[in-house]
A protein has these predicted regions:
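Short amphipathic alpha-helix that is part of the acyltransferase structural core
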Residues: 1-30, 142-159
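Active-site rim helix/loop that mediates acceptor-substrate recognition in acyltransferases
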Residues: 16-49, 96
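A conserved beta-strand-loop-helix scaffold within acyl/acetyltransferase catalytic domains
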Residues: 33-51, 56-75
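Short loop segments at secondary-structure junctions
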Residues: 50-52, 79-80, 134-137
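Conserved acetyl-CoA pyrophosphate-binding loop and the N-cap/start of the following alpha-helix
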Residues: 80-89
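Active-site signature of alpha/beta-hydrolase-fold catalytic machinery across serine-
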Residues: 92
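Conserved active-site alpha-helix within GNAT-family acetyltransferase domains
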Residues: 99-105, 109-135
Protein backbone atom coordinates (compact mmCIF):
# COMPACT_ATOMS: atom_id res chain seq x y z
CA UNK A 1 0.00 0.00 0.00
CA UNK A 2 1.01 3.56 -0.66
CA UNK A 3 0.23 6.99 0.70
CA UNK A 4 0.36 10.00 -1.62
CA UNK A 5 1.24 13.37 -0.14
CA UNK A 6 1.92 16.91 -1.33
CA UNK A 7 3.84 17.71 1.86
CA UNK A 8 7.23 19.05 0.70
CA UNK A 9 8.83 18.12 4.03
CA UNK A 10 8.35 14.42 3.21
CA UNK A 11 10.22 14.49 -0.09
CA UNK A 12 13.43 12.50 -0.27
CA UNK A 13 15.17 15.02 -2.52
CA UNK A 14 18.34 12.93 -2.91
CA UNK A 15 16.27 9.92 -4.02
CA UNK A 16 14.20 12.01 -6.45
CA UNK A 17 17.37 13.51 -7.90
CA UNK A 18 18.98 10.08 -8.30
CA UNK A 19 15.89 8.68 -10.04
CA UNK A 20 15.54 11.55 -12.46
CA UNK A 21 19.20 12.26 -13.20
CA UNK A 22 20.12 8.62 -13.83
CA UNK A 23 16.97 6.85 -15.05
CA UNK A 24 14.50 9.36 -16.53
CA UNK A 25 15.19 10.05 -20.22
CA UNK A 26 14.01 13.66 -19.95
CA UNK A 27 16.26 14.57 -17.00
CA UNK A 28 19.46 12.56 -17.45
CA UNK A 29 22.39 14.39 -15.94
CA UNK A 30 20.24 17.02 -14.20
CA UNK A 31 22.28 18.52 -11.37
CA UNK A 32 21.17 18.36 -7.76
CA UNK A 33 21.10 22.17 -7.63
CA UNK A 34 18.81 22.27 -10.68
CA UNK A 35 16.53 19.64 -9.13
CA UNK A 36 16.39 21.52 -5.84
CA UNK A 37 15.45 24.72 -7.69
CA UNK A 38 12.76 22.86 -9.65
CA UNK A 39 11.31 21.44 -6.44
CA UNK A 40 11.36 24.85 -4.74
CA UNK A 41 9.39 26.45 -7.58
CA UNK A 42 6.79 23.69 -7.95
CA UNK A 43 3.99 21.78 -6.31
CA UNK A 44 5.45 18.35 -5.50
CA UNK A 45 3.83 14.99 -4.83
CA UNK A 46 5.38 11.88 -3.37
CA UNK A 47 4.10 8.35 -2.97
CA UNK A 48 5.34 6.54 0.11
CA UNK A 49 5.21 2.89 1.13
CA UNK A 50 2.86 2.78 4.12
CA UNK A 51 4.88 0.12 5.94
CA UNK A 52 8.28 1.82 5.68
CA UNK A 53 7.59 5.44 4.77
CA UNK A 54 10.12 5.16 1.93
CA UNK A 55 9.35 7.32 -1.09
CA UNK A 56 8.59 5.18 -4.16
CA UNK A 57 7.25 7.74 -6.67
CA UNK A 58 7.33 11.44 -7.49
CA UNK A 59 5.47 14.00 -9.58
CA UNK A 60 5.96 17.74 -9.97
CA UNK A 61 3.51 20.41 -11.12
CA UNK A 62 4.50 23.86 -12.35
CA UNK A 63 1.43 26.06 -11.89
CA UNK A 64 -0.04 29.40 -10.89
CA UNK A 65 -3.02 27.51 -9.36
CA UNK A 66 -5.32 29.86 -11.28
CA UNK A 67 -5.20 29.19 -15.01
CA UNK A 68 -2.62 26.60 -16.00
CA UNK A 69 -0.50 23.68 -14.84
CA UNK A 70 2.28 21.59 -16.34
CA UNK A 71 2.67 18.06 -14.96
CA UNK A 72 6.24 16.83 -15.20
CA UNK A 73 8.92 14.63 -13.67
CA UNK A 74 6.45 11.80 -13.03
CA UNK A 75 8.52 8.83 -11.91
CA UNK A 76 7.73 5.51 -10.24
CA UNK A 77 10.63 3.51 -8.80
CA UNK A 78 11.23 0.28 -10.74
CA UNK A 79 10.37 -1.91 -7.73
CA UNK A 80 6.96 -0.20 -7.40
CA UNK A 81 5.93 -0.35 -11.07
CA UNK A 82 3.17 -2.53 -12.44
CA UNK A 83 0.72 -2.04 -9.57
CA UNK A 84 -1.16 1.06 -10.74
CA UNK A 85 0.87 3.49 -8.64
CA UNK A 86 1.56 5.82 -11.57
CA UNK A 87 -2.17 6.08 -12.26
CA UNK A 88 -2.90 6.62 -8.55
CA UNK A 89 -0.25 9.33 -8.32
CA UNK A 90 -1.53 11.21 -11.37
CA UNK A 91 -5.12 10.83 -10.10
CA UNK A 92 -4.06 12.42 -6.80
CA UNK A 93 -2.44 15.30 -8.70
CA UNK A 94 -5.62 15.78 -10.77
CA UNK A 95 -7.80 15.72 -7.67
CA UNK A 96 -5.53 18.19 -5.86
CA UNK A 97 -5.70 20.63 -8.79
CA UNK A 98 -9.43 20.25 -9.55
CA UNK A 99 -10.77 22.72 -6.94
CA UNK A 100 -8.60 25.51 -8.37
CA UNK A 101 -10.60 25.79 -11.61
CA UNK A 102 -7.64 25.46 -13.95
CA UNK A 103 -8.57 25.37 -17.63
CA UNK A 104 -6.02 22.69 -18.45
CA UNK A 105 -3.11 20.63 -17.26
CA UNK A 106 -0.50 19.79 -19.87
CA UNK A 107 2.22 17.18 -19.95
CA UNK A 108 4.61 15.58 -22.39
CA UNK A 109 5.33 11.86 -22.54
CA UNK A 110 7.03 9.47 -24.91
CA UNK A 111 5.90 6.22 -23.37
CA UNK A 112 3.09 6.51 -20.81
CA UNK A 113 0.07 7.70 -22.79
CA UNK A 114 -2.06 4.87 -21.40
CA UNK A 115 -1.38 5.87 -17.80
CA UNK A 116 -2.41 9.45 -18.42
CA UNK A 117 -5.44 8.55 -20.56
CA UNK A 118 -6.86 6.56 -17.61
CA UNK A 119 -6.89 9.79 -15.62
CA UNK A 120 -8.54 11.85 -18.38
CA UNK A 121 -5.62 13.26 -20.37
CA UNK A 122 -6.06 13.30 -24.14
CA UNK A 123 -3.90 14.34 -27.09
CA UNK A 124 -3.88 18.04 -27.95
CA UNK A 125 -6.78 18.88 -30.25
CA UNK A 126 -4.63 21.39 -32.14
CA UNK A 127 -0.96 20.63 -31.54
CA UNK A 128 0.01 23.02 -34.33
CA UNK A 129 -0.99 25.92 -32.09
CA UNK A 130 1.66 25.06 -29.51
CA UNK A 131 5.28 26.12 -29.77
CA UNK A 132 8.39 25.76 -27.69
CA UNK A 133 11.19 28.24 -27.02
CA UNK A 134 14.42 26.27 -26.42
CA UNK A 135 16.67 28.39 -24.21
CA UNK A 136 19.39 26.00 -23.09
CA UNK A 137 21.82 24.38 -25.51
CA UNK A 138 21.39 20.66 -26.05
CA UNK A 139 24.15 18.74 -24.24
CA UNK A 140 26.61 17.00 -26.54
CA UNK A 141 25.44 13.55 -27.53
CA UNK A 142 21.78 14.18 -26.62
CA UNK A 143 18.71 15.22 -28.54
CA UNK A 144 16.17 17.80 -27.25
CA UNK A 145 14.41 15.07 -25.27
CA UNK A 146 17.58 14.19 -23.36
CA UNK A 147 18.08 10.92 -25.18
CA UNK A 148 21.21 9.66 -26.83
CA UNK A 149 21.40 11.45 -30.18
CA UNK A 150 21.39 9.36 -33.32
CA UNK A 151 24.64 9.56 -35.27
CA UNK A 152 24.34 11.84 -38.25
CA UNK A 153 25.51 10.91 -41.69
CA UNK A 154 28.71 12.59 -42.76
CA UNK A 155 28.51 15.08 -45.60
CA UNK A 156 31.65 13.47 -47.00
CA UNK A 157 31.11 10.41 -49.16
CA UNK A 158 32.65 7.21 -47.83
CA UNK A 159 35.92 6.31 -49.55
Amino acid sequence: MYEISADPARLDVARVHRWLSTDAYWALGRSLAKQQAAIAGSLNFGAYATDTGVQVAYARVVTDLATFAWLCDVYVAPEARGHGLGTSLVTAVRDHLAPHGLRRVLLATDDAHGVYAKVGFEPLAEPGKWMVLPLAPVPAGQDRRGRQAEPTASAEPAR
